[in-house]
């Protein structure tokens, strides 16, 4: 007997998690996972950061540790420390009390809160401009709340570099007051970031058109190994822009606590006016969706950010991860050059962060998976964190084979 839900359309599985499922099911011993964005150590294993281990020990030794509900706004110490790490201790937004912050379910949850806030309260535009390409989930997050999406130029496929001219042109051509999502650092999927000089031009163009900037910061400290450097674009935006600034912050990657869903949403206002009203609306969003955010991860990150010795250890952990990833970029580039693989592979070392936008097309990616058990996202994005000294030569030879034996046309 049929029922009222019998006609619901079945959707295809999520591309990234579908890729992971195929990898897990693959019995070939030489398989390599360059798909999902999670750090791996030199042995290809998940790495619990030393700073996280010590913070976990300290919070469990605290007699006051418990599993009580957090306030709707989140763990206060975490929310405050998270704002300072991304905006800077001396941020005028913090000192002038014109910042509204709330704990979220990592970066995706923060983007969801931002999207909900925009859809309800931003009347100038309901279109979010996303870089071309961008993280695939951006589209779902915004469109699920009724917002429209459009794109702006970012990646030049021919030169494997940033299309800054097209980027600025699209900012200028967008209707005044449009919403622009900006990757703060370690752009996903390209790994290619604007220079500081280019960021100044981008921010000036946004200011001239009175656009609403929305920064997505998922990799602070993970891109360059330096927290301040990776937050530079956001802090410069706070300095020069006159519109509100929305910031979505994740601690999944940079503390390696992917499954704990630790994040924050920050709204920098031009003046402190109406802060209590805005916070009250954000609290209703949280209360109606998850009641209050999870405590454990927030307490770990708070302990790291507010304990000088742990914060210093965390900074070293970030250097360890970023340097290992960069070393694998160099190794892969050098091996491809040594093999004489057709094409120019310098873009691999010019990119930063977890990912490399390899330039491989869908046919080549499919052949890597079927013939060599090397798993990449169909766009050609590779998680460099999945490379190590034991598999990088195998991966280079696999790439060499598919480039030589498939079409170079997309």
Which role does the model predict for each range below?
Residues 1-4, 406-410:
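Basic/polar N-terminal segments that are highly enriched at the extreme N-terminus
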Residues 2-74, 81-84, 288, 294, ...:
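N-terminal "arm"/small-domain region of PLP-dependent enzymes with the aminotransferase-like
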Residues 34, 149, 213-214, 245, ...:
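Hydrophobic beta-strand scaffold residues
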Residues 58-59, 64-209, 220-222, 228-240, ...:
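Conserved core of the PLP fold type I
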Residues 97-98, 348-353, 377-380:
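Short Gly/Ser/Thr- and Asp/Glu-enriched loop/turn motifs at secondary-structure junctions
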Residues 239-316:
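Conserved core segment of the aminotransferase class I/II
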Residues 313-371:
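Conserved PLP-binding catalytic core of the aspartate aminotransferase-like
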């Amino acid at each position: 007997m049929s029922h009222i839900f019998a006609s619901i359309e079945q959707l295809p599985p999520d591309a990234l998690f579908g890729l992971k499922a195929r990898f897990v099911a693959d019995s070939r011993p030489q398989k390599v996972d360059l798909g999902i964005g999670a750090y791996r150590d030199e042995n290809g294993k998940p790495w619990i950061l030393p700073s996280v281990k010590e913070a976990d020990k300290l919070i469990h030794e605290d007699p006051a540790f418990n599993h009580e509900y957090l306030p709707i706004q989140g763990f206060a110490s975490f929310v405050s420390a998270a704002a300072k790490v991304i905006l800077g201790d001396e941020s005028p937004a913090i000192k002038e009390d014109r910042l509204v912050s709330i704990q979220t379910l990592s970066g995706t949850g923060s983007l969801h809160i931002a999207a909900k806030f925009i859809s309800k309260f931003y009347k100038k535009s309901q279109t979010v401009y996303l870089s071309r390409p961008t993280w695939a989930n951006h589209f779902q997050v915004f469109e699920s709340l009724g917002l429209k999406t459009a794109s702006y130029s970012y990646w030049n496929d021919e030169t494997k570099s940033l299309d800054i001219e097209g980027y600025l042109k699209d900012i200028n051509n967008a209707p005044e007051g449009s919403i622009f999502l900006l990757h703060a650092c370690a752009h996903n999927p390209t790994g290619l970031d604007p220079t500081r000089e280019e960021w100044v031009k981008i921010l000036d163009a946004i200011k001239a058109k009175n656009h609403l900037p929305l920064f997505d910061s998922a990799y602070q400290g993970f891109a360059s190994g330096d927290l301040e450097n990776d937050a530079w674009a956001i802090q410069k935006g706070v300095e020069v822009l006159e519109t509100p600034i929305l910031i979505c912050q994740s601690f999944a990657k940079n503390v390696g606590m992917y499954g704990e869903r630790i994040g924050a949403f920050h709204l920098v206002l031009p003046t402190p006016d109406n802060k209590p009203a805005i916070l009250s609306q954000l609290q209703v969003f949280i209360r109606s969706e998850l009641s209050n955010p999870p405590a454990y991860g927030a307490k770990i990150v708070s302990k790291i950010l507010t304990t000088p010795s742990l914060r210093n250890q965390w900074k070293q952990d970030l250097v360890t991860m970023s340097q290992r990833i960069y070393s694998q970029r160099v190794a892969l580039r050098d091996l491809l050059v040594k093999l004489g693989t057709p094409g120019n592979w310098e873009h691999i070392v010019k990119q930063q962060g977890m990912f490399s936008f390899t330039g491989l097309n869908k046919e080549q990616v499919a052949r890597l998976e079927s013939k060599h058990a090397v798993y990449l996202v169909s766009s050609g994005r590779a998680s460099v964190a999945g490379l190590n000294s034991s598999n990088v030569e195998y991966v280079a030879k696999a790439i060499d084979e598919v480039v030589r034996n498939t079409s170079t046309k997309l």
